[in-house]
Design a protein with these regions (language model features):
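Conserved NTP/Mg2+-binding pocket subregion across the NTase superfamily
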Residues: 2-7, 72-175, 183, 189
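Helical scaffold of the NTase/Pol beta-like nucleotidyltransferase catalytic core
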Residues: 1-36, 66-68, 274
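Nucleotidyltransferase catalytic cores
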Residues: 131, 137-274
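Short secondary-structure boundary/capping segments within folded domains
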Residues: 26-28, 43-48, 83
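Short, solvent-exposed polar/charged micro-motifs at secondary-structure junctions
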Residues: 44-47, 99-104, 229
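Catalytic metal-binding acidic patch
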Residues: 39-77, 88-93
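Long, highly charged amphipathic alpha-helices
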Residues: 17-25, 70-77, 258, 262
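Residues that form or immediately flank small-molecule/cofactor binding pockets and catalytic motifs
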Residues: 40, 96-98, 226
Length: 274
């Protein structure tokens, strides 16, 4: 594996073996042009067994229906045999001839199923800034760069059109994934809007503290991402009494929504959203 730009932390052996197995499986099933890594593994904040494994497999042409079925089987087999990292694989399958438009949807695999979604400006910027090349051409050879204006517009639209309305659905925020992504996305978006840079999830925790996020939320998030693997994340790690354990998800949801609403509004107002 080589970096598209600077060298990063070594890939954990089990994840490296998984990537080799996945690459071989792709080469046997689809017309593979390149395989790239982005997200936490490429950015240097990867927590094996906890982080998603974010990949882009560039195809020489669109996958056929038969190839889509083959990809589904490959992902299911990896998830059954490859451990936690394999179950966390998210992979986009764009056609190399259709990479110009950041809004265009491409075949992908996430959350245990095939779907279609865009290769977003944030993903594209990650690939150019710190993407890892597992196979084939690097991003610079085939992936158009996004402008700062495109990146800013996407980040603002994501906050305004997705995350702010999501706060109107209290049940969403009872789940770890919504709490984590909502908080981390706000912090990372704020930094990107401020200076154009991309930060890791670990760095986002410090940003959230500076934005006034409640300490119990940050302790809970930090524990689930970085705490001892044998210790179940929960309210004890977040400074909440054990007697309140059953009530913590609801309390955490309230804290998260109460913080995120005004914080998102301030960020949108500060960076030019009308």
């Amino acid at each position: 594996m080589r970096a598209a730009t600077d060298a990063r932390e070594p890939v954990p052996p089990a994840t490296a073996a998984l990537l080799r197995t996945f690459l071989t499986g792709l080469q046997d099933r689809v017309p593979l042009r390149a395989l790239w890594v982005h997200g936490s593994l490429a950015g240097g904040d990867y927590q094996e067994g906890r982080s998603d494994l974010d990949l882009v497999a560039v195809l020489a042409r669109p996958a056929t229906a038969r190839e889509e079925a083959e990809l589904t089987g490959l992902h299911h087999r990896l998830a059954a045999t490859g451990g936690p990292a394999a179950r966390a694989v998210h992979c986009a399958y764009p056609d190399v001839t259709a990479l110009d438009d950041p809004t265009r949807c491409h075949l992908g695999w996430a959350h245990g199923e095939l779907l279609h979604r865009p290769l977003t400006p944030v993903t594209r910027r990650e690939l150019h800034v710190f993407g890892l090349v597992q196979y084939g051409d690097g991003p610079a050879a085939v992936l158009p760069r996004v402008t700062d204006a495109q990146l800013t517009a996407f980040v603002l639209a994501d906050l305004r059109g997705f995350w702010r309305p999501a706060l109107e659905h209290p049940a969403y925020w009872l789940r770890d994934v919504w709490v984590d992504l909502g908080l981390l996305t706000l912090a990372r978006a704020t930094v990107t809007l401020r200076d154009g840079s991309l930060i890791t999830k670990g760095e986002a925790l410090s940003v959230l503290a500076g934005m006034g996020a409640p300490a119990p939320l940050l302790a809970d998030l930090r524990h689930r991402r970085y705490g001892p693997p044998a210790t179940a994340p929960g309210p004890t790690a977040a400074g909440v009494s054990a007697t309140d354990r059953a009530h913590w998800p609801a309390r955490r949801a309230e804290l998260t929504r109460a913080f995120l609403g005004p914080a998102i509004d301030r960020t949108l107002a500060a960076y030019g959203d009308g």
